[in-house]
Curated annotation (Swiss-Prot):
GO CC aspect terms: extracellular space
Family of this protein: Belongs to the insulin family.
SMART domains documented for this protein: IlGF
Function noted in UniProt: Insulin decreases blood glucose concentration. It increases cell permeability to monosaccharides, amino acids and fatty acids. It accelerates glycolysis, the pentose phosphate cycle, and glycogen synthesis in liver.
InterPro entries per record: Insulin, Insulin-like, Insulin-like_sf, Insulin_CS, Insulin_family
Record's keyword annotation contains Disulfide bond: yes
UniProt GO MF annotations: hormone activity
Subcellular location: Secreted
GO biological process: glucose metabolic process
Full protein name: Insulin
Entry-linked PROSITE patterns: INSULIN (PS00262)
Amino acid sequence: AANQHLCGSHLVEALYLVCGERGFFYSPKAGIVEQCCHNTCSLYQLENYCN
């Protein structure tokens, strides 16, 4: 999958898809917004935010 710009609800939806039942921590302070919204991120990078 190509890198994507993911912001707000799109970012949360992508985390649900990637993490599934594991759940995830959505903390803007963790740099996920910086990484995925201001720049682009891959699904592989999103997995770093799963629990």
